[in-house]
Amino acid sequence: MKKIMIPIFSLLIFSCSKDSTNDSNDLDNNNPEFTANQSFSIEEHSAFESSIGIIKATDKDNDALTYTIQSEADLIINENTGEITIGENTILDFETTPSISATISVFDGTTIVDEDIIITLENIEEYAILTAEQKELVDYFRYLTLWEDSNALSSIQKWGAPMKIFLDGAISTDYKATVQSVLDQYNALFNLGTFSITIVETKTESNVHLYYGNAEEIETLWPDMHEIIEGKTYDGYAISSGTGLALNNSRIWISSPIESLLKHELGHSLGLGHSNKCDEEKSFLCSTISPNNDFLDVEKEIIRFLYHKDMVPGTTAEELNNAVGNLILLN
């Protein structure tokens, strides 16, 4: 779902150059002139056909004036009135494009005069203009990525580099196929960025070590994890770590072949906490799961946005509402 959004323009017009072209021999013709110090504004994420403002020019001969515009952005100008509006293919976002250049041309029937302008974009609070449903998505994004079910984090955690998983323990052909199926489902959700998860053949080339076996086997392999799971009823566990703001290493223990358990522990490794959508909706991130637990549609969107190329590792709780809101509006 792609929404066309338009940022607030403070259309600040600076005369970088002013050229005239006269193809006739009418030396008595007066060139048209742009009105000085014009400025315009429009809200970020405004709708298609929203008006930025009207470029004004005058002609001492009272000739009829015709306007045209050239810009890398999809901007439209009314040739008779000079009103600039947003084109259908315009996606204007303050966070990625704080200003836009354009050239306005005015023609009086004899002479063309050009004016280079800079359109500056003003930021808005994206969360404030979301629908109620969109705000619910943001709130649930916060719940999962800030681990609000337990000790809430102050910023999100996510992987910077692709995951490379080494499979260890009692890995049967059938279970390896299950792992690949789960990875395929996850990878389909990373379509807004460059992140991916793959299986590798050696531990040396991996950054994720997945072990399939019983809890007792973890005591020798990962003593620190065994201290956590000993005496508990856990069927799996994941511990991730990183450098700076990005995750880059994970250890995952799995004791059951059900697909939902692997999805669950991989979700934790990717930076997601437990869900509160468990009584009826059966999220794959519920603390207690069965084969019936799976990705909810809203969770698929959350994974897409978490691993969007513009979602920065370490985005703080204070920044999160507008960061996610911006991605919702742009996608």
Model-derived features: positions:
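Short, charged/polar, Gly/Pro-enriched secondary-structure boundary elements
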Residues: 91-93, 127-128, 215-220, 291-292
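Disordered inhibitory propeptide/activation segment of secreted metzincin zinc metalloprotease zymogens
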Residues: 125-173, 181, 187-188, 237-244, ...
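Metzincin-family zinc-dependent endopeptidase catalytic domain
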Residues: 173-278
